[in-house]
Structure formats: structure tokens, C-alpha cells
Amino acid sequence: MRKSGTSTSSKSTRRGVCAGGVTDVGENRDQEAEPKAAAARAAGATPRWHFIGQLQRNKAKSVIGYADVVESVDSVRLATALDRAAAGRPAPLEVLVQVSIDGDPERGGAAGDDIWRISDLVASSAALRLGGVMAVAPQEWDPDRAFEQLAGLTERLVSTHPEATTVSAGMSSDLEAAIRHGATHVRIGTSLLGMRNTLR
């Protein structure tokens, strides 16, 4: 599945994207995502909204107000905050565990045993649903090497949680490598809409 990011786009462009058949939309800034989601609803568009940016725990309640999927869960503390915020939703919030492929603590993403702790916590929650994993290939890595490593982590996760089959990996610059190694969702907003501008 392809997923469009609308971070760069005007309201008219976003309406056109939805009218053109895009069913999943990704956003990485909470302060921009909520008004975009509200505008889409007012225009009669109902895409699935994916939050893909780094998320602070104090924004959990805001995000669950519009997001169908949060792809950037990289700590037990954030998963716990989302679990509390999502209590009472009509349907569980889908969560992807953001994986750090290179283990660099300066980047977003869980590494080592934290991946499995987060996965187990989400899978045990009534308010959350474990969908799978999300990752960004490190810029200095060969994309095939990065996504091959992610595929190994995904295989291990699915062996424990068979429902966690979503692999959100690959962007406009490396989507071919991601697909070769099992990506089910690619993030191609830049290809569709161009580079980021401010919200209009």
C-alpha cells in the first residue's frame, strides 16, 4: 500500500489527493495534522490518518483524537500514554513499533529488547492494536542492507504476534529496496506533493 504525506500541501491539494483515491494519509506534525483531519472530514473525505512523526507523551491525547494509526511508538512510556489516552475509543488505536535499524540512541526508534517489551505491552492492551513495525533506513546505510535487517526483526515479531504484519518502510528515495524486503506500506508524500512547505 502506498501512503501519501500531506505535510507539504495546501488544502486544495489535499482534497485532490483524497479525491484521487488515496486512502491512507501520513502526517508527522501533530499541530498541523489535527486541522488537516478536521478539514478533510468537513469536505467529506475519510482517509485513514497515520501519525508518523516523533511524538511526545503529552501529545498522546491530541493524536488519538484524529489518528487511526500511530507509527512512531518507540518507548514503553509512550505506549503506556497512548493506552491511557485511547481508553474508551470505539475501536482500538493501531500502533506500529518504530524500530531503530542501527541502534543509534540519537535517532527515533526502539532497539534491542525494548522492541519486544513495547510489542508485548501493545498486544496486551484493550485500547491498542499491534499492527507491526515502522522504520527509516539510516542515510549512511545501503537501503537493501537496512531493510533486510528490518525483515529479520519483522519475522521474529510475527512469530510471537501473528497479527503484526504491517511493515511501514521506505520513502520516495528508497521505496524499491523496502518493497524488495517486504514493506507493506511506503511513505511517498514527497514524490506526490513535493518538498515540505508551511501549512496553508
Segments and roles (model prediction):
Residues 1-173, 179-181, 193-195:
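Conserved alpha/beta-domain cores
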Residues 183-200:
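Gly/Pro- and small hydrophobic-enriched strand-loop and loop-to-helix capping segments
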